[in-house]
């Protein structure tokens, strides 16, 4: 039988040093969240498609398949909706501070360079309407990046209510809204100028400026307030100012008033994290106060933060932070009747490991191949050095 030895698009293997680094990063992140008082939650990788089929996930690219009963299931494309399902269906008492880590899957287009399988970690703060919840998410994200020694990172703030308010006042069709969203995301000055000419409103000056309204937080927010008198937008700008003042002591904070998240469920402050050594954002999140309504008749205020751990592993590697794995310095060849003694000797000797070869000569050959400087033989007669690499 000829097996297909290629990997599915958007997936990859991790070996040795990279795999160990990814494992340690996930441990560090989870430990950091635990220290901040977050309680861990785990959900299945496989969910029924209904969990992700709402309007909030209209753009999600799902891995779909049928179970043995013919029901449509998917590999989860994010963690937030499954956690919303748990909170809404188990009757847990709010408010909650939850943390998680695990795999997510998104069926991206071929040759786009995106990973279809990602390791994600994050937090969900549910039941807190206060802006302190956003502040906690941002501070937690900054704390993780500092703990991982990520160099030259920057946190960028936006506000989902700004885009929603603009769309509300323009009263666009679904097709026109998609086109407008694309113009905003691409910061197309020419395209937006043409759009405003064809769709005049009281927000013309503000909309025309959106492609330029990004950069240092204080200056951009001050400029934006002079471009509109709309109460909804001004309220959003005030919330952004409050957060900037609260967290700017911890990191470099910028704003982008044209920031539009891929998922439509965000309702308030949104944020992303970037670094000099990364091509894309590796941290994202924001407020979504109506997301849980798809699972229950009532809504709960919520804020979430997600970290792409694969991107953070790559960042650490590029920054030279990932340490080499501790090399084996002693190989222990043993006779079966001396196994107990060999095991005890290994436990007491740092950077040692047992040999699985039947003969001492094979153990020595292995040590030479993998640059292990010393081999000992453990037998009923005791412990004897049988190979020692010459020091140059």
UniProtKB/Swiss-Prot annotation:
Molecular function via GO: catalytic activity, acting on a protein; histidine-tRNA ligase activity; transferase activity
GO cellular component, alphabetical, reads: cytoplasm
For this protein, the record's Gene3D superfamilies field holds: Bira Bifunctional Protein, Domain 2 (3.30.930.10)
Gene Ontology biological process terms in this record:
histidyl-tRNA aminoacylation; L-histidine biosynthetic process
**Keywords recorded for this protein, A-Z:** Amino-acid biosynthesis, Cytoplasm, Histidine biosynthesis
Quote the InterPro entries the UniProt record gives. Answer: aa-tRNA-synth_II/BPL/LPL (IPR045864), HisRS-like_core (IPR041715), HisRS/HisZ (IPR004516), HisZ (IPR004517)
Q: In which pathway does it act?
A: Amino-acid biosynthesis; L-histidine biosynthesis; L-histidine from 5-phospho-alpha-D-ribose 1-diphosphate: step 1/9
SS bonds (residue pairs)? none
Q: What is its main location?
A: cytoplasm
State the compartments where it is located.
Cytoplasm
Q: Which Pfam families match?
A: tRNA-synt_His
User: At the top level of its lineage, which domain of life is listed?
Assistant: Bacteria
Record-linked HAMAP family: HisZ
Q: Which family does it belong to?
A: Belongs to the class-II aminoacyl-tRNA synthetase family. HisZ subfamily.
Q: How does it assemble?
A: Heteromultimer composed of HisG and HisZ subunits.
Give additional notes from the record.
This function is generally fulfilled by the C-terminal part of HisG, which is missing in some bacteria such as this one.
The record's annotation in NCBIfam families points to:
hisZ_biosyn_reg, PRK12292.1-3
Role this protein plays = Required for the first step of histidine biosynthesis. May allow the feedback regulation of ATP phosphoribosyltransferase activity by histidine.
Name recorded for this polypeptide: ATP phosphoribosyltransferase regulatory subunit
Species, as recorded: Listeria monocytogenes serotype 4a (strain HCC23)
GN (gene name): hisZ
